[in-house]
Amino acid sequence: MNVGIIGRGGREHAICYMLNKSKKVSGIFCFPGNAGTSLIAQNVNLDLDNFSELERYCLKKDIKMLVVGPEKPLVNGIVNHFKGKSIRVFGPDKISSKLEGSKIFTKKICQKNNIPTSKFKICESLNETIDYLKNSYFPLVIKADGLASGKGVYICKNFNDAKIASEEIFNGKFGVAKQILVEEFLDGEEMSYFIVTDGKNYKFFGSAQDHKRVGEGDTGKNTGGMGCYSPSRLLNKDLELKIKKKIIEPTLNAINERGGVYKGFLYVGLMIKNNDPFLIEYNVRMGDPECQTILPTLNTDLFDVLISCCDGTLNQTNIDFSRSKSICVVLCSKGYPEKFKNNIKIKDLNQIKLLKKQNIFHAGTLKTTSGLVSNGGRVLNFVSTSDDFLKCRDDAINLIKKLNWKEGYFRRDIGHKVIKT
C-alpha cells in the first residue's frame, strides 16, 4: 500500500522510518517532509490547507492511507474532509481534535466528568484577567486557549510575570485570543502517557518524560521539546489503572457523546503527585520528541497498528514493545526558541556510522544543491536505545559530538531525573 505522511519534523521522519521497514508498505510520500524523509520517501510540496488538492494528489498516486503528524490539519478537519472516501486518514476528527485545539474545551470536559485536573478560571479579556490575578495565589499557570506549538504555557511566579504573560496572549502572540485560561499550579512530576484508539478500543502506546525548557536543569523558556526519555520512571500498575479509569475512559466517552470519532494517537500530559494522576493537557497526535524516542522500541509493524485503527479492528492487533530504554537528545539552532538563523550548512552527517540501536531523525533540515542546511529551530534528533539510560544518553551525545555542528545547541542532562551520576 502507498502511504502518505503529513508533516515536516522529527516525529514524521520517525514514522516514515518505521513504515519503511514494513513489507506491507510499497511507497511513502511525505507532505512536505524534510531532508531525512527524502532518503526513504518522496517529498511533496502542497498547500496543506487545501484538502481537495491533497485528495487529488493522493488519488493520482494511489495513496490509500494518510498519517497526520501535526495537530493543525486535524484541528482544521482533515479527517472530516476524507470521511466516506477511498483514502483512510489516521487521526481524530474535528470534534475530537478540540481536545488539543481548545484547552478550555478540555477543561469543561474534565469539569463535567470529574476528571482530576487543576482548578481553573476562564477569563475573556485582559482587564478581567488582571483583576482576577490581583487576588490570586502564586505560582500559577497561564495558558493560551488555542494551538501554540507547545509554547503557549506560562508558569508565573508572581503578579508581574502573570500580567506580562496575559498581555502577550491577548496581544496576539499565538493568534487572535478571545479567552485565556488561568490555572492552579500543580506540584509534582510530569509524565506523558500514550494510547492508540480505533474509536471503540484503545491500547497503550508508550510512556515518556519530555524536557520542555531550553536550559539544563529545566531552566529557561519553553520549547517544543529539547529531549526525552522512555519509559517514564513514574509508571506502575496502580498509577496506570488510575490513568485509564479516571482520565482516558471518561474522556473518550465524552467525545463519543458529542458525536466525535477518535481514531489515532492520544497524548495524555499528566502531573503525578503521590502516585495520583492529574491531567495537564491532551495532544491529539504523538508528541515530538516522544515519538522519536518511543517508536524505535516498537516490535510490532507500525503499519498494522495504523491500519487497524483506521479500520476499527485494533482489538485484533497485538502491540508489543521491547523492554529497552530510550533517550532522544534534540540538536537545536543556537538562539532557539527565540531568534535563530536558517540555511546554515550541516557537514558530514552522512559520515557518522550508526550502530544497530542508534538513529538520527531529521527535523528542521533541508536538502539543497549546496548540501544539507538547517531549516528550523529543532534540527536533528539523536536517539539511542539500550538496557541502561546513562548509556543511551552518552551514545546520543557522542553522535552529536561526532557531527561537531558549531551552530547547534543541545542539553546534556536529558533524563536527569532517572539517571543518577
Where are these regions (language model features)?
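Internal nucleotide-binding/catalytic subdomain
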Residues: V153-C291
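Short acidic-hydrophobic, aromatic-tinged amphipathic segments that line or gate anion-handling sites
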Residues: N43-D49, K121-S125, C156
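A conserved helix-loop-beta module that forms one wall/lid of the active-site cleft
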Residues: F90-K151
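Active-site "cap" helix and flanking loop/linker of ATP-utilizing ligase/carboxylase catalytic domains
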Residues: K244-L266, N283-L355, L366
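ATP-binding N-terminal substructure of ATP-dependent carboxylate-amine bond-forming enzymes
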Residues: M1-K94
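Generic C-terminus detector
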Residues: T365-T369, V373-T421
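Short, charged, surface-exposed secondary-structure boundary motifs
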Residues: S38-A41, K98-I104, G215-E216
